[in-house]
Amino acid sequence: MAGIGFELKKLFRRKGLFATLRAYGYAGVICTGPMLLGVLLQVGMLVLCGWAGAARADQDLLVCMVTYTLLASLTVTSFFSMPVTRFLADMLYEEQEQTILPSFWGSNTLLLVGGCAAYGIFLIFSGATLMQGLLCLWLFAEMIVNWNAMSYLTAVKDYRGILWAFVAAIGISFGLGYLLIFLLGAPVLEGFLFAITVGYGCMMLLETLLLHRYFPQSKESPWTFLRWVDRFLPLAFTGLFTNLGLFAHLVIIWAGPIGIQVKGLFYGAPYHDVSAMLAFLSILITTVNFVVSVEVNFYPKYRAYYSLFNDGGVVGDIVTAEEEMLAVLNRELYYTALKQLFATAAVISLENTLLELLPLGFNDLMHGYFRTLCVGYGLYAIGNTVMLILLYFTDYLGAVLASGVFAAAAAVGTVISLFFDQAFYGFGFLAGAAVFFLLALLRLDYYTSSLPYRVLGQQPIVAQTKSGRFTKLALFLEKAAERGESDAKK
């Protein structure tokens, strides 16, 4: 993400309202693309369903199918996301760009084989029709490639191309959905599901073309990145735990008193799910601000501080640079939290007026969920920002600890909330997010209190190469590929 912040700094140097809006738009799409796209498409399709007079059962099933597919794909890709990002950073630093595209297809292969097998088994027994099941599986595969490509696109500086891929996915989905349902009279559920699938497919195609434009094709091993998973295993679990903490409360609510069996294995809680989707949009201000403000202003100080260790800086300069870096960090984190507080307060104040404009049938219970989850997502956004700063300082233990506690606290808190009145269901996630924020903040304060020792004293004297199951898997796949090539030559 540091590369993104560095490049965005160039955009923000340009004067004018439109230049500023464009930079914020680029940052928003790059950093929140997966969930933002999913939420916008679901809300938009629900609005179109309302205009089309679709039955409530069809609307609920459409939301369930897209939500299940979205959450499953994000969870599957979350384990590789951070190690792959670290692999990309190392390869770009070492000017080994020829390894990037092979690793993209290698990671896609593993994710698609494992993910599609598991999700396919679920769909077989889910009660979905053959057409619905095939569309869900197709959408799942596209989402996996899209989310994986977003990790790789952090190294691409063509922000206009990324933005157009995002806009194309939304435009094609809505346009095709309108054409199929309103003009051709296709079934509402299958028509909108097909439209969303085609939209994600176009986004996948555009993102893949961008990657091929910037990185060369080569015959390098597509499994090299697996060694980075072993080396940075805490990063893999940090990504997984963060996603589990973010989504577990939704699944638990589906099994609670307000959950309904929509069809077969598809369960949902429409009152809670729609409120959660819209509340999630309230954290965009913090997610974008992290890149635009924290990284753009903090990263130069961070780089100057660590360069003093690498270039033989004197003690006085190191102490001064540390004080300046931490002062900028504290200021930017304070402003980030303040902006999220104002954004949450504004959304809660205006939600009655704004939500009444959408034909989503909001009632008092949904308004309550929305307000509670806005606060919860706001705390999560700030906590996640602090956790990312821990990763900046290579405090992988602190990051995985904070994310693990977040996943456990959000899940346990949601389970406990089920024993209370339905109006309190969102407070379980809110409590988990509050614990996440406090723990990450305390860990950051503790870690930075002795930063020179962390930089110098905790480094291994002799370089160590970690080898585990993923390295063994890489060796096995490489040998299998070599045997296949030798057999083909014979």
Residue ranges and their predicted role:
Residues 1-41, 60, 64, 226-235, ...:
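N-terminal membrane topogenesis motif
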Residues 20-36, 163, 221-248, 333-342, ...:
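Hydrophobic faces of transmembrane alpha-helices in multi-pass small-molecule transporters and flippases
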Residues 63-89, 243, 247, 276-301:
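Small-residue-rich midsections of specific transmembrane alpha-helices
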Residues 67-72, 108-113, 121-153, 163, ...:
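Alpha-helical transmembrane segments of multi-pass membrane proteins
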Residues 92-104, 273-356:
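Specific pore-lining/lateral-gate transmembrane helices of multi-pass inner-membrane transport
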Residues 153-179, 390-412:
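Alpha-helical transmembrane segments of multi-pass membrane transporters/permeases
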Residues 165-212, 423-445:
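Hydrophobic alpha-helical transmembrane segments
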Residues 195-199, 203-295:
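Transmembrane helical elements of multi-pass membrane transporters/channels
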